[in-house]
Curated annotation (Swiss-Prot):
It comes from the Bacteria. Its main location: cytoplasm. Belongs to the SecB family. One of the proteins required for the normal export of preproteins out of the cell cytoplasm. It is a molecular chaperone that binds to a subset of precursor proteins, maintaining them in a translocation-competent state. It also specifically binds to its receptor SecA. GO terms for cellular component: cytoplasm. The gene is secB. Residues 1-10 have a biased composition (Polar residues). This is Protein-export protein SecB. The keyword NADP does not apply. It comes from Parvibaculum lavamentivorans (strain DS-1 / DSM 13023 / NCIMB 13966). Pfam families: SecB (PF02556). Residues 1-22 are annotated as: Disordered. Transmembrane segments: none annotated. GO terms for biological process: protein folding; protein tetramerization; protein transport. It is found in: Cytoplasm.
Length: 168
């Protein structure tokens, strides 16, 4: 195949006005940081008297790498406790490098903090499940995340928090 006649997405984000279709491509995805703590092992690995309480935190960060390329990092942390005693703590920073072309500027933030994390979430979820299982616990299967709700919540809470998610 020939590369003639293609712009490889380097024309910037203005193409949407020219009738070109918006494009979102995952260039790569990777673990930036992974931490697992099992502070009370091996005592915490036996049968528990009660179900652990699991607190899950989710955040999305965006970093502009070029005119069309963005790193989107999905940060997920989970802590399991029984009677205020830590069972495990897992933190994952999982990112993808995305190429976004022909998306109007007013829609760019929503694409980056909703659609991009939605595409990499299943991979991050599997890593968390495998990590907790390898730590001696049942796999932690996080429910699907409502990234639209997270986006709306961030905009309602404070304009400063919403500005932090905008590509820089």
């Amino acid at each position: 195949m020939s590369d003639q006649g293609t712009n490889n997405g380097e024309s910037g984000n203005g193409g949407a006005q020219n009738g070109e279709a918006p494009q979102l491509r995952v260039l790569t995805q990777y673990v930036k940081d992974l931490s697992f703590e099992n502070p009370n092992a091996p005592q915490s690995l036996g049968p528990a008297d009660e179900q652990p309480s699991i607190n899950v935190r989710v955040d999305v960060g965006v970093k502009r790498m070029s005119a069309t390329d963005f790193e989107v990092a999905l940060k997920i942390g989970a802590e399991a406790t029984v009677k205020d005693k830590a069972m495990f703590l897992v933190e994952l920073d999982y990112a993808g490098l995305f190429r976004v072309v022909n998306v109007p500027e007013q829609d760019l933030e929503a694409v980056l903090v909703i659609e991009c994390p939605r595409q990499i979430f299943p991979f991050a979820r599997r890593i968390l499940a495998d990590t907790t299982r390898d730590g001696g616990f049942p796999p932690l299967m996080i429910d699907p995340i409502d990234f639209v709700g997270l986006y709306n919540q961030r905009h309602q809470q404070a304009p400063d928090a919403a500005a932090a998610a905008k590509p820089n």
